[in-house]
Design a protein with these regions (language model features):
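Bacterial N-terminal signal peptides that target proteins for export
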Residues: 1-11
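Long, intrinsically disordered, low-complexity accessory segments associated with secretion
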Residues: 3, 17, 23-24, 150
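Bacterial N-terminal signal peptides
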Residues: 10-19
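Acidic, serine/threonine-rich low-complexity disordered tracts
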Residues: 24-111, 115-120, 125-215
Length: 215
């Protein structure tokens, strides 16, 4: 698994809107994505979004297993708990097992900075930071995003790619495609006319395509 593949999985593992989801209340949503490597299913990435007086809380859980013949060639586990207010990240606590390499990220916004610890190392970031929050279309406006696995700030460039037909909820729907690029990332995202995130594809850099399909 090369660096570009790990970066792709890491950012997607941060990875994170309503149509077809299981809704427990008007303020809570659950988003479930089946994840494929080319045509082979490798796991799921699920999100729990809860809105309240204190802002929005997001819990993201990903489990991927890439098998080669009868062996598990790659294992990825990620869990992130984020608290948001006014479009800015207030708190984050994330743990990742990237095929045996562990990452721990903890952060809290204090005054005009986001105080972050990555594997015990302290950093100070700007106060209003966004992760790769695909569940919130406004994140597409940000030129810099936080990788919740590594704690790194990533410069990104977004291009609108026009409208396409995508299958979602048992039918074909109009979906707007965006292309998000960084040094080691090339990601396509699809949103419905209502702004619901329904799909993702990313080139892993080794001739394989990582793909999210909304369940």
């Amino acid at each position: 698994m090369n660096l570009r593949t790990r970066n792709t999985l890491g950012v997607l593992g941060a990875l994170l809107i309503s149509t077809g989801s299981a809704v427990a209340s008007p303020s809570q949503q659950t988003l479930r994505f089946k994840v494929f490597l080319d045509q082979s299913p490798i796991g799921e990435h699920n999100f729990e979004l809860t809105a309240g007086d204190s802002g929005k809380r997001v819990v993201s859980r990903a489990e991927f297993d890439v098998k080669l013949l009868f062996f598990n060639a790659y294992r990825y586990r990620h869990e992130s708990r984020e608290q948001w207010r006014d479009g800015c990240l207030e708190r984050i606590q994330a743990t990742t097992d990237d095929n045996g390499t562990d990452y721990r990220v903890q952060g809290r916004r204090i005054a005009d900075v986001l105080s972050l610890q990555v594997n015990g190392k302290s950093e100070r970031l700007p106060a209003c930071v966004s992760t790769f929050a695909y569940w919130e279309p406004d994140f597409l406006k940000r030129p810099v995003l936080l990788n919740p696995q590594t704690g790194e700030l990533v410069d990104v460039k977004l291009e609108a790619q026009g409208w396409e037909r995508k299958r979602f909820g048992g039918r074909e729907v109009d979906a707007r495609r965006y292309r998000l690029r960084a040094d080691d990332l090339d990601i396509s995202l699809w949103y419905t006319t209502e702004g619901d995130w329904i799909g993702l594809e990313s080139d892993t850099g080794k001739g394989k395509m990582l793909r999210y399909e909304r369940m």
